[in-house]
Amino acid sequence: MERKRNPLSEFDWGLVSIYAVLLLFGCFSIYAASYREIMATSFLEVFNLDTSFGKQMMWVGVCIVMVVVCLLLDSKIYTTLAYVSYGVAIVLLIAVLLFGKDVNGNKSWFGVGSFGIQPAEFAKFATALALSKFMSGMNIDIRNNTRHLFTALAIIGIPACLVVLQGDLGSTLVFCSFIFVLFREGASPLFLIIPFVTMVISIITLKYGVVTMLVVDALSLLGLLYFFRKKKFNPNLLFVIIIHVGIAIYSLGVNTVYMNVFKDYQRARIDYVLGKYKKEKKKPAVQEVVPIVDKNAKKERKFDDWNVRQSMIAIGSGGLLGKGFLNGTQTRFSFVPEQTTDFIFCTIGEEEGFWGTTLILVLYILLLYRLINTADKQRSTFSRIYGYSVAGILFIHFMINIGMTIGIVPVIGIPLPFISYGGSSLLAFTLLLIIMVKLDADRLHVLR
């Protein structure tokens, strides 16, 4: 007699459990970071939608309902609606450029009453679906077919370019995670080498100056020309010359964008990370910073590295075991701007200490490992590529967010998955992960 199928037993409860623990950490951290805001209203009104914690609790409730709905739906619907969701995301990204409101210099939000919706967060999810749908099509071969490869790059590049126009550098960088997906699916290793080389060129140009980069490039080219001097014309020589000319043009482009496109505070953040202020013994540029909680406080002019300095102080002061829940001085007195969003990790570091931050790191590593391992086991090409996409997106968010809180990455504004305050990001991350859980649950019922 055939055994009756139990859908609950097919879900990856390991992934769901990690998600739940991270969500719980996020709730406690947001409560701690917005404690003064809560106390300013009333402790009995802890779920008041006028507070950050109250709003986040509402979004957590929405996410729980959404998790149940996503797990109950037929997994085929995600394949069917992949291109539709991508099209809707593109329309929203265009609409927000025309009708969105300006927040911190970025025109990337729709204002709906006291709430805000950020289409870029959902565009990542939609791009993951669309890329998975395209690359799982019949006879699609990005390794040997250039047209297929450029189509995949276009699917990634269109929303990325629209997000760039919004001024949201952080979300733009997240789209780079799809390059790892292409590489995993057989694209040339150049897709990993080229970004690394361009990053090195950019760092040399910004840290030591465009003239230094051009001199290094010219000396390298002269050395290679000397090496080829006694040989007959070689096509490789022409290729080498083209590469070096390209490096020079790229370096000039980086310098032009840095000087004429980036704002003063963005240049100051990059300079601080590159150590230029320490070397030149100059104070960084200043910017307007308003404390998170005290809305009536006067604007204070602080050094642009204030966020990073205070974040590192908070993490370092936590020590091994932390100061205890609601006992963090940096947290309670709002020394760190944006502490409920971009700098939420320093709240955990101050109040929970080394053990708390280590636990968060371990949870993220386990989540990424389990996602990649789950993706490798998929029978469906769509599910496999989607799993790689989810892992890539979460990795970029995790790496950049924690990197900027400890001062090794410029402050570009990017949330910590499942922990940072924000309804759009929490909904998008939840959709990303839970759809993968559903696809994996149906893995054994997919024909090879």
Task: Annotate each PLM feature.
Residues 1-3, 401-448:
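A juxtamembrane structural motif centered on a specific transmembrane helix
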Residues 2-19, 53:
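N-terminal membrane topogenic signal
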Residues 15-28, 92:
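N-terminal signal-anchor transmembrane alpha helix
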Residues 20, 36-38, 42-300, 346-406, ...:
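Hydrophobic alpha-helical transmembrane segments of multi-pass inner membrane proteins, especially
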Residues 28-38:
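Membrane-helix interface motif
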Residues 114-126, 167, 319, 323, ...:
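Glycine/serine-rich anion-binding loops at beta->alpha junctions
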Residues 156-163, 303, 312-320, 324-330:
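Membrane-helix interface and discontinuous TM-entry motifs in multi-pass inner-membrane proteins
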Residues 308, 312, 321, 325-374:
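A conserved mid-to-late transmembrane alpha helix and its immediate loop/hinge
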